[in-house]
Amino acid sequence: MRGGCISQGKAAAGLLFCVMVFASAERPVFTNHFLVELHRGGEEKARQVAAEHGFGVRKLPFAEGLYHFYHNGLAKARRRRSLQHQQQLERDPRVKRALQQEGFNRKKRGYRDINEIDINVNDPLFTKQWYLINTGQADGTPGLDLNVAEAWELGYTGKGVTIGIMDDGIDYLHPDLASNYNAEASYDFSSNDPYPYPRYTDDWSNSHGTRCAGEVSAAANNNICGVGVAYGSKVAGIRMLDQPFMTDIIEASSISHMPQLIDIYSASWGPTDNGKTVDGPRELTLQAMADGVNKGRGGKGSIYVWASGDGGSYDDCNCDGYASSMWTISINSAINDGRTALYDESCSSTLASTFSNGRKRNPEAGVATTDLYGNCTLRHSGTSAAAPEAAGVFALALEANLGLTWRDMQHLTVLTSKRNQLHDEVHQWRRNGVGLEFNHLFGYGVLDAGAMVKMAKDWKTVPERFHCVGGSVQNPEKIPTTGKPVLTLTTDACEGKENFVRYLEHVQAVVTVNATRRGDLNINMTSPMGTKSILLSRRPRGDDAKVGFDKWPFMTTHTWGEDARGTWILELGFVGSAPQKGVLMEWTLMLHGTQSAPYIDQVVRDYQSKLAMSKKEELEEELDEAVQRSLKSILGKD
């Protein structure tokens, strides 16, 4: 695994974002997909070249001049590169470059077995959908739910919003999904056709996407199954799983599919959750995601929702480059009594949580939703179930305010998520330097649909985002068997420059470190305002790798709203019984946020809310800084 950089937009002022570019240590697998770039000419020329060489072709929407060639006469997965076909393309004078796509693994997450409210719904499973309205059913804790009832009573159901389910397909003929299915926004990238219907298997293993779709957009009051969180929204099927291996082209094409029609992309999959994998998006997918947040939805940005992972306490979602991306909203899960699910991974990049099952409790404590071939289920689970619930809540907020940007949605998530009655047996709830309460597993709490739509309705778009390299430590530092080296880095957060960052959103610690056993490594970072983020926890089960991390961007959301100026502290050490040793080669601090206070212009309706608290802090800070400027001016005149 190695790192790389990608530039993004004028706001970055030429800054390179450090991102993940991966090289697997495993023996490569080659697919029948090729990335082809032409010297000149458009789609017609590409179709001509492809036809002459026996390929099918698709234009890649996120890059000019790049095409996806696929050859149905080749095996979908083989150990040897097809030199004949690659050289055939490379020798064509119209072709600038041709690259056969390597295959890699992506796994569905959480695919495992396990009344009186003033809302009139006649769907038979509605009373079992405790995550929508929890009255204590299935031994749950009353009131511990997504508070969708308040949003629905305000008239918000997700109308005018389309959610794309990137998965193994959806049963769009299902009577509870058919009326809300958006065929125009759907596509099957596994079969290259516009019909993303799941491939049949005897064990129904390809029901994953259909279940996720039902959580979001199942129709209401049709006497079938249950209802979606945003039952007035449209759902699009993007079939891209269910093939021997994933490729960068298929992932990138899925993430960038119809970005002016699809508002929210929901992903309940990622690298293998085995406690030893460090993996994430490749070059094209990173480019597609950057393109999505910059250009999607007419420039407001595509909203990417990601399941944080199902590796449990033996894994860390900061080793997943999708869940830990700044461009995604990473969602964890709680069970219906507020405890953590046994499969929950914890990490500092998780923004919030929703609900799923995950302990051997009441058989009706799973997630009720649609299933294949017109059926219903009570057994959907994992963070796979959590991400679509979040996508549904975000659809309600978008209906309330279609002008919300991808960053607005993250700010709303931080400000309206609630601790409620969530309980993490391992990590305490803490407050960051500006008073925002967070947890290492649950993020800023469980989503509250009612609170989010009410705040979204009056929301003013947050100020422009800037990016600052806060500094870098380049001197190698040995990590002994015992004890933790402490490194410090003092930064002015680019103050006085056009890319000054005053109010933090995301912070990345880009780290290069060698270790005799990567899984025993623990990394913490403390901000100038005293907030400690656990960037990497021990992964005891399987991570025996000696390769360490190479320019890996560990991300934290825990310092949201803080002032980045001052001294940052990085601690590294080994946790475990066997003695280990390592060397920190590099630590670079990347700061992302705004120069002006993001909440100054927001309307406060609840004076006990996090928004009211944050706005008060901002006003006091602005006043203090104004006084300081005045004093300097007066003293300067004297």
UniProtKB/Swiss-Prot annotation:
Protein name: Neuroendocrine convertase 2
UniProt similarity note: Belongs to the peptidase S8 family. Furin subfamily.
The gene coding this protein: PCSK2
Disulfide-linked positions: 225-376, 317-347, 468-494
EC number(s) per entry: 3.4.21.94
InterPro entries, per the entry: Galactose-bd-like_sf, Kexin/furin, P_dom, Peptidase_S8/S53_dom, Peptidase_S8/S53_dom_sf, Peptidase_S8_Asp-AS, Peptidase_S8_His-AS, Peptidase_S8_Ser-AS
Propeptide: 26-109
PROSITE patterns on file: P_HOMO_B (PS51829), SUBTILASE (PS51892), SUBTILASE_ASP (PS00136), SUBTILASE_HIS (PS00137), SUBTILASE_SER (PS00138)
GO molecular function terms noted in the UniProt entry: serine-type endopeptidase activity
One Pfam family per UniProt: Peptidase_S8
Keywords: Cleavage on pair of basic residues, Cytoplasmic vesicle, Disulfide bond, Glycoprotein, Hydrolase, Protease, Secreted, Serine protease, Signal, Zymogen
Ranges of residues in domain Peptidase S8: 129-453
Annotated function: Serine endopeptidase which is involved in the processing of hormone and other protein precursors at sites comprised of pairs of basic amino acid residues. Responsible for the release of glucagon from proglucagon in pancreatic A cells.
Entries under Gene3D superfamilies matching the protein: Galactose-binding domain-like (2.60.120.260), Peptidase S8, pro-domain (3.30.70.850), Peptidase S8/S53 domain (3.40.50.200)
Signal peptide residue numbers: 1-25
Organism: Bos taurus (Bovine)
